[in-house]
Curated annotation (Swiss-Prot):
Belongs to the 5DNU family. Residues 30-142 form the HD domain. This is 5'-deoxynucleotidase VS_2195. GO terms for molecular function: 5'-deoxynucleotidase activity; metal ion binding; nucleotide binding. It is an enzyme of class 3 (hydrolase). It comes from Vibrio atlanticus (strain LGP32) (Vibrio splendidus (strain Mel32)). Its EC number is 3.1.3.89. The record marks 18 as: Appears to be important in orienting the phosphate for catalysis. It is found in: Cytoplasm. GO terms for cellular component: cytoplasm. Its cofactor is a divalent metal cation. PROSITE patterns: HD.
Length: 194
């Protein structure tokens, strides 16, 4: 049996910090972020199914969220202003991410590649599933801004405004429900939510 380094690479997600150009009150790594995205994506799918006649598989979507940034164990977390500085850079970075996804997939024993491929390779999920995970990813970044601003860190004001614009572009009934029901608590202290 051939040795696989796949899970050793995934274990390094905890070493890759998000928001590398920002001064943060609380640091966040991609392992923590991916778990939160999985939680939120799962909730969005449930909300869509129960409130807005969706037909999604929430558990599958949670897994998509859990694995959505795994390629960053090979690429690192490129800051958003750099990643989207211009269309050429964004397009080239997508190619780098795709190569990293394929490399990660190739680390798995052959018999498991088809099982992991839908979670590791971007674009294999259907559009509705991708949309839910993108919404969850954006919501989690927005919630991070709320937490930082609530802790008095004004460094996140512009990021919050930018993310509000992105949320508006990705608007959906399930996202509105989530933001109205759950997001305000992120601006409260532990005593206030207890």
């Amino acid at each position: 049996m051939k040795q696989s380094h796949f899970f050793a690479h995934l274990a390094r997600m905890k070493l890759i910090q998000r928001w590398p150009l920002m001064r943060s009150v609380s640091s966040e790594n991609i392992s923590e972020h991916s778990l939160q995205v999985a939680f939120v994506a799962h909730a969005l799918a449930l909300i869509k199914n129960k409130k807005f006649d969706g037909k999604l598989n929430p558990e599958h979507i949670a897994l998509l969220g859990m694995y959505h940034d795994t390629s960053e164990v090979l690429t690192g977390d490129l800051p958003t202003p750099v990643k989207y500085y211009n269309p050429d850079i964004a397009q080239e970075y997508k190619k780098i991410e795709a190569a990293a996804e394929q490399r990660l997939l190739s680390m798995l024993p052959e018999e498991f590649r088809d099982d992991f491929s839908p979670f590791l390779i971007s674009g294999t999920a259907n559009k509705e599933e991708q949309s839910i995970v993108k919404q969850a990813d954006t919501i989690c970044a927005y919630l991070k801004c709320l937490e930082e601003l609530s802790a008095g860190n004004h460094e996140y004001e512009q990021a919050k405004r930018r993310l509000e614009e992105t949320l508006e572009q990705r608007k959906s009934p399930e996202m509105d429900y989530f933001l109205t029901t759950f997001a305000p608590s992120f601006e409260l202290s532990l005593d206030e939510i207890s």
